[in-house]
Regions:
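Conserved ABC ATPase signature
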Residues: 111-112, 137-141, 145
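Helix-to-loop junction immediately C-terminal to a conserved catalytic motif
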Residues: 51
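The feature captures the beta-strand-to-loop junction immediately N-terminal to the Walker
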Residues: 36-38
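Conserved ABC ATPase "signature" region
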Residues: 100, 115-133, 158
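Hydrophobic anchor residue at the start of the ABC signature
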Residues: 151
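Conserved ABC transporter NBD signature motif
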Residues: 59-67, 76
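Catalytic Walker B motif of ABC-type/P-loop ATPase nucleotide-binding domains
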Residues: 162-166
Length: 175
């Protein structure tokens, strides 16, 4: 079975300076892969590079044997969702609105949601036990609730790959 996601001799870093070199990963569909290391070791930098948020220094990232840099943003968003540790700060959006942004790769130019999109949004909220906060402003919920909403947004994309950077950070103990 060929890997769904691969990196080949990937070098990552900032301002053209490679901090980590020769990263080679092969991730099979349906598998969970973790990057473990101390703070500051480059795990987030590797993840940001894999998903295209940070330019690579050298090497290749392949998704379904296609080079990531040849895929459109829409194609990438249909294949891959990401939840990073950086917090988003949407103004005037409810939690449902934030989750619904996960459907944008599947909508038309105006981003209007169809009935199926609305069903997927609700199902994603329910999967993370966040239905009761769906209509609350995103800015008015706890960090743990925000993390659940961001996880719901990733699920709402219905991607083949979900990249999570410290996914349990901010989660409330009682949930």
């Amino acid at each position: 079975m060929s890997a769904y996601l691969q990196t080949q001799d990937l070098s990552v870093g900032y301002d053209g300076k490679a901090l980590i070199q020769n990263v080679c990963l092969e991730v099979q569909k349906g598998k969970i892969v973790t990057l473990i290391g101390p703070n500051g070791s480059g795990k987030s930098t590797i993840l940001k590079t894999i998903v295209g948020q940070l330019g690579k220094i050298s090497g290749t990232v392949l998704v379904e044997n296609a080079a990531m840099d040849r895929l459109s943003r829409r194609e990438i968003a249909q294949k891959m969702a990401i939840v990073m540790t950086e917090r988003i700060h949407p103004e005037l959006m409810t939690c449902r609105d934030v989750v619904a942004t996960g459907r944008y790769p599947y909508t038309g130019a105006l981003g209007l949601l169809g009935e199926r999109d609305k069903e997927v949004v609700q199902a994603s909220l329910d999967r993370v036990d966040a239905g009761e906060i769906a209509e609350r402003p995103f800015s008015a919920i706890s960090d743990g609730q925000r993390q659940r909403i961001l996880l719901a947004r990733a699920l709402c994309q219905e991607p083949e790959i979900i990249v999570l950077d410290e996914p349990t950070s901010y989660l409330d103990i009682r949930y």
